[in-house]
Amino acid sequence: MPELPEVETSRRGIAPFLQGKTLSHLTVRQPRLRWPVSETLLTLRDRPILSVQRRAKYLLLELPEGWIVIHLGMSGSVRILPALTPPQKHDHIDLLLTDGMMLRYTDPRRFGAWLWYDSLATASVLAHLGPEPLSEAFSAEYLLEKARGRRTAVKPWLMDNTLVVGVGNIYASESLFSAQIHPDRLAGSLSADEAHLLVQTIKAVLQRSIDQGGTTLRDFLQADGKPGYFAQQLQVYGRAGEACLTCGTTIKRSKHGQRTTFYCPHCQR
């Protein structure tokens, strides 16, 4: 699933081609995604795109009348292509520009979304989200306050979007390893020093992934069609049975709900 670094990588890739340009119209070949494609999108004609933003894992295209809100789902990606590029099997939506280019949305598993909101204040999908992890609002003090009394394992707790957005399975595993915190530790047991270190490692891991164009494990591609390269730097995720790169201990895997967790039993306490 594309996580925050992949979505931010996509935003940075498409923004120069969309921002300040004019939307001609949209072509929707498959409206049945996670939620039905908003019918308003089919009525848009010759509208300027004012900005290309991101909130959590959502891409936000600002138009004068409202916002196109895009979620990449489990397997989605967006690319900038010439408008006459023939569609392939899983190319479900094209946003065509008046300059002869287009934004193409590809989603093999069709679990993404293309929605319309007159205002972000009414965007139900953005309600109740926690702070951005790379913002000043996500601090050690904030994390420690939220952790107080929590008897939830720290790994799934970090993945709760009401706590902080965009720390998905890959980056929660990698951040906990870097902070040397066992994923089964209770959130409420974190010390002030551990909270400080964990916040710093989350920010560092996410920033490194953004700098590397995200993590491509299966379907994700950058806006130019290239994969992300952070997968080559993963320390524990997907490495069960292999030696820890720090101490040589065998990397273990466990389940938290439906998510697989990877960790080093020696480095993480």
Swiss-Prot record:
EC number: 3.2.2.23, 4.2.99.18
Keyword Secreted: no
A Pfam family matched in the record: zf-FPG_IleRS
Listed SUPFAM superfamilies: Glucocorticoid receptor-like (DNA-binding domain) (SSF57716), N-terminal domain of MutM-like DNA repair proteins (SSF81624), S13-like H2TH domain (SSF46946)
Bilayer-crossing regions: none
UniProt xrefs under InterPro entries: DNA_glyclase/AP_lyase_DNA-bd, DNA_glyclase_Znf_dom_DNA_BS, Formamido-pyr_DNA_Glyclase, FPG_cat, MutM-like_N-ter, Ribosomal_uS13-like_H2TH, Znf_DNA_glyclase/AP_lyase, Znf_FPG/IleRS
Record: residues binding DNA: 90, 109, 150
Catalytic activity: Hydrolysis of DNA containing ring-opened 7-methylguanine residues, releasing 2,6-diamino-4-hydroxy-5-(N-methyl)formamidopyrimidine; 2'-deoxyribonucleotide-(2'-deoxyribose 5'-phosphate)-2'-deoxyribonucleotide-DNA = a 3'-end 2'-deoxyribonucleotide-(2,3-dehydro-2,3-deoxyribose 5'-phosphate)-DNA + a 5'-end 5'-phospho-2'-deoxyribonucleoside-DNA + H(+)
Free-text comment on the cofactor: Binds 1 zinc ion per subunit.
Function: Involved in base excision repair of DNA damaged by oxidation or by mutagenic agents. Acts as a DNA glycosylase that recognizes and removes damaged bases. Has a preference for oxidized purines, such as 7,8-dihydro-8-oxoguanine (8-oxoG). Has AP (apurinic/apyrimidinic) lyase activity and introduces nicks in the DNA strand. Cleaves the DNA backbone by beta-delta elimination to generate a single-strand break at the site of the removed base with both 3'- and 5'-phosphates.
HAMAP family noted in UniProt: Fapy_DNA_glycosyl (MF_00103)
Listed PANTHER family: FORMAMIDOPYRIMIDINE-DNA GLYCOSYLASE (PTHR22993:SF9)
Protein family: Belongs to the FPG family.
Name of this chain's protein: Formamidopyrimidine-DNA glycosylase
Origin organism lineage: Bacteria, Pseudomonadati, Pseudomonadota, Gammaproteobacteria, Enterobacterales
Gene encoding the protein: mutM
